[in-house]
Structures are given as structure tokens and as C-alpha cells.
Amino acid sequence: MTNKREDVRNIAIIAHVDHGKTTLVDELLKQSGIFRENEHVDERAMDSNDIERERGITILAKNTAVDYKGTRINILDTPGHADFGGEVERIMKMVDGVVLVVDAYEGTMPQTRFVLKKALEQNLKPVVVVNKIDKPSARPEGVVDEVLDLFIELEANDEQLEFPVVYASAVNGTASLDPEKQDDNLQSLYETIIDYVPAPIDNSDEPLQFQVALLDYNDYVGRIGIGRVFRGKMRVGDNVSLIKLDGTVKNFRVTKIFGYFGLKRLAIEEAQAGDLIAVSGMEDINVGETVTPHDHQEALPVLRIDEPTLEMTFKVNNSPFAGREGDFVTARQIQERLNQQLETDVSLKVSNTDSPDTWVVAGRGELHLSILIENMRREGYELQVSKPQVIIKEIDGVMCEPFERVQCEVPQENAGAVIESLGARKGEMVDMTTTDNGLTRLIFNVPARGMIGYTTEFMSMTRGYGIINHTFEEFRPRIKAQIGGRRNGALISMDQGSASTYAILGLEDRGVNFMEPGTEVYEGMIVGEHNRENDLTVNITKTKHQTNVRSATKDQTQTMNRPRILTLEEALQFINDDELVEVTPESIRLRKKVLNKNVREKEAKRIKQMMQENE
């Protein structure tokens, strides 16, 4: 009979984006008495970085711990977005059970499926929380049936299918085992976790085994490895061995051990089997590596991380406006920042190219890479990035590309247009149903390159009423056809100067304008989207000729259409292969790779000729 540590439970909270997972963790923290009576607590306290708070999403996995009646519950809050799935997979190794949070109205969504699949593969015990039960449109019974169907589809074992269900309202801080009535607190959730999630095995008297699952960095203590003690004990000052991924061994001394209490990371002297801790002392510690005693070097199985599916080129900013707005503009500074990102983000890959000021950066998806760019921009970096490209992989001699599972809910009158547009992007319909409130729910498998830039088109097609989610499904044999991409050409500035109201008014018939009057522009910069398929070079700096002749009708007031200001994501989705996005702390500009019109036209002719010769 193996001993268990009944005073500890290790759980991960998984859910789809925006189903209330981080709010639920906040309430668990508050009700466990972690905060003082007079302590101010931010909403969504676990989403600690600015972008997480702005977008209302969790990007990095976070640890916290609460005490309930003498039992310490270690909670890992995981990202709900598949782009950050690299984090999710490693967390599953650190815990013994998962709390699956599902919206009482929306039910199961693609990301729920992605993360749950990882949890079931690790044989973890699930507890299902049907959240937002207080919503008027809640349909708890239907959602529980959907969850059961999903478990069966993901080949859960019999024990996992017997999952307990807790009905909760995280915003109100209430829960119960009965969907019809709510208790005043989350007590039923705490007790369900303690009753159903297995306690960790207590083998503290055996030789130490600690595996790193997440990384952090601190200017004072350097690199920090976060993980679980699987066996034995670890004390500050211990001399231990680190078994690297390639099998080599490095010795180091444990300088600090941190435990988690509420949102704080506190220094502790000792940790034992079953504890989730952070360790410092080894500079180049990496995810998946094992810490053991010198005399008992036994590595744990290496953690497998999903490969990147999307890549883009990062370049030093060489536009005419380079260096005007950013603090960090050189190749060395950008290289250092990318290396720093690699310290903690294991789903990211950075490769050098023939050019010293260009790098290929590969990640798990558009969101993953755009959040890195947004972070760099806010830190004062200037750079240029290319259109995202999917990564082609050779599997058993066949060239394969990533496919995504797309789930969308649209008003019935828009369903035909959405089906047609996904079909044009080589999507394959898996399912089509009508929801209780009359929306059409569509499920497609679509090549990932077909989804680049699709969200904007989808939103305009459904007039903002549609909901779309997509997540990586698998690699499949590559489709040879051209998929997706922008159909219209660009309006390109022919000159450097300031955009004038007079010129913008004259261009409104030509397409959609991106510029406010007075915006500085340069030759080769994209200032709008053309109505037609070809690019058009325009003079957006043209001013009205002043004469001393007055005209009675000429100066009547003209109204100008509001310019379309692109966000970073929209800019990345908009550009074509021969274009770049220039990113600075103050601006997001679009430009052609070749700024000069004559050189650009010669290059286009040359490429066209080569293609004809190859045919």
C-alpha cells in the first residue's frame, strides 16, 4: 500500500477562452482567506500582464495555492488558447486532476477539446464545473450531455467518464451540486476537488526527482525552474545533479526554493514529494530536465512539446522613418530580446538567416506571434515583420501542412455565405447543427493557411453577430491549390510627406483609406486598400493649388469617410508576400518590401517571366 499525502492536492484549471476560469480562481483565493480583510484585489488577479488584462485572456500558465480545512490545493491556471498549448501539455505532468470549466450556455468549444484531450491522455481525474449558471440563457443539462459526448469522443476511460459535476457562478462566488439552487459559497467545489482528485504519493524517503515544467526569469536570482517534486526531498544548499535533455549531467547548488501561497511566491527551506515549487541556482536549466542527487542519477521521461505551425520573418526596421520612435532598433538588441523570449517560451523557435539583421521566428499560431510582437513594441523595440506562413512538414515521405478545427456559430441567414467562404478555403464540413436559440453551429476542418486573415472576413460577413474559434487539429497531406490571401490590391504612396485632406478626399472613390490627415507617409508605404485587384500608386500628399480666383461653389463643406485604422493582428492578416508590417512603439505601418515603384515593377515582371518559363 503506497502512502499518500492527504494534505495536498495538485490540480490544473482548464477551459475555453472567456468561460470564467480566471474569475473562478480569484473567488477560490478570496474565499480561502488568502487576502487580508482590507487588501485590495484586482479582478482577474491571475492575469498579471497588461496584454492578458486588455484582451481578457490567459497567456502564461500561473501557479497559486489555497488552503481549505488543512488541505493545500495547488492550482495551475492554464491558457485556454491553443496557440499557447505548449504550456498546457507540460502542466498536465505536474498535476493529478483537472477542473474543466464550461460555460452553461456555450457548452464545449474547440479549445476545451484541445486541452481536455491532453489531460485525458495523461490519465488525470476530471471535475466538471458548469459556470455562469446564473445566466438567463443557461442550459446546464444540455451542456453536461455535450461534455459527456466529448469525453466519449476523446476516448476517456470508464473512471474518467464518472466525473462529478459542480454548478457554479464564479462572478457571484457561489456553487452547488444542484443546478436549481446555489449555495452562498464555493464550499461544494472545494470538497469535490478534495474527494475526487487523488492525493500525491508520499515517497519523500526515496532519492530526489524534480522535473522542470515551466521557466521564469528574475534579475536577482537568474533563471528559475518551476516544477514538481516527484520523489524525495529538496533543501536549500543541497548539491544536486541536473540531467540535461541530451543526457549530459551538470552539478549545481540549490540557492533558493520558492513555494506558492495565494498569489505570492515565498522562499521556503525544504520541499517534498508532491509539492509544486520554483528552484534557482542553475543558469541554463531547461524545460523537461530532471534534478536528482549525485549518487542516484535517474531522469524522468522528457516532456514532449507540440511543434510550431506558423512562422514569420522578423527584420531590423530599415524604412525611411527607422529610429524615430523606438529605443531599441539594432540587430543586436532585437537578437538579445528574441533570445530572452526563448528563455521562458519553449513553443517558440528562432533561426538565423543568411542576413545578420533577419530572423525566422516560428510559433504555435497567429496569436502567439502577435503577442510577442506587441510585447516588444510596448518595450520600445522597432522591427519589421512579414506575412505569417504555415510550416510544411515531411511525414513518411509526404509533404504535410497543419489543419485546424474551426467551430462557428452564425445567424441562419449568414450560414450559406460562411459555408461557401470556408469551402473556397478548402474547408471540409464535419458537422452542422441548430442551437437552442436558432443559431447555426458549423464545424469544419480547414488548412491553417486558409484561416490566416479569415476572422476579419467572417466578422463582416456575419455583421459582427458570428462567433468563431479555431484550434490546431493535425498535420495532413498538403493541398496544392492557392488558398486564402487578400483579393484586392493596395493603394501605395508615391512620395514622402504628410497625408493631406485634399488628397484623401480625391482617393475615396479608389478604395478604403488607412490614413488620418496629417499622418507622415513615405514612398512605398501602403495607405489604403484598392477597390480592384491591382496595386495603385497614388499621391496622398497632394495639396490644393492656391489661386487668387474665388469660386462660389468650390469650397462647400465636404465630409470625409473615417479611415480604417488597423490593429497589429489585422495588419498581419492584411499583408501579402511582397509586403511588410513596420512595428514601432507609436505606429503600425504597412509597406512594400521594395519601396521604389520602378524597381518594384521590374521585379514583378521578372517573377512573372520566371513563372511562365517554369510552366
Model-derived features with residue positions:
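Structural and coupling elements of P-loop NTPases
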Residues: 1-615
